[in-house]
Amino acid sequence: PDRFCPFPGGRGEPDCASITAAIEACTRTKCVKSLGKPDPIMLQVTMEGLDARVEHSMMVGDRLQTDIQMALDTGMVSGLVLTGEATADDVRALTDEHRPRYVMDRVDRLIPAAVWHELGWTDDNRTDS
């Protein structure tokens, strides 16, 4: 599970793994099963609930060890957005079997160019939070 959730400016907020670690420390009990990322159960249950097929879907995320690994473990196409902790150098260092199929600087790159044009969007429309 993710230890922290990155925010603009380099700060982070506690995420599932750090909260689990705090509970383990307080209770002196080890968590025996995590159903969060990268465990494929999350995507499998979601896909069943949506009556969707893995081969017609794509998991997009900003973390290699959780988002992309979950997609790979589920057999789903993966897309990495370089807005989180992963960098292009991190992707280049991966073996082919661990590399996401798509890598993009922004999630709106998934929108076809024709739609961008129809909406009058340009790269200048980017807003950084």
Model-predicted regions and their roles:
Residues 1-129:
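Asp-based, Mg2+/Mn2+-dependent phosphohydrolase catalytic module
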